[in-house]
Each structure stands twice: as structure tokens, then as C-alpha cells.
Amino acid sequence: QEYTGWMDF
């Protein structure tokens, strides 16, 4: 999972 700065669903 890449970090988007928000919750990864």
C-alpha cells in the first residue's frame, strides 16, 4: 500500500 496521507481502503 502506498502512503497517501489518508486512510487506504
Curated annotation (Swiss-Prot):
Hypotensive neuropeptide. The modification Phenylalanine amide is found at F9. Expressed by the skin dorsal glands. It comes from Phyllomedusa sauvagei (Sauvage's leaf frog). This is Phyllocaerulein. It is found in: Secreted. The keyword Secreted applies. It comes from the Eukaryota.
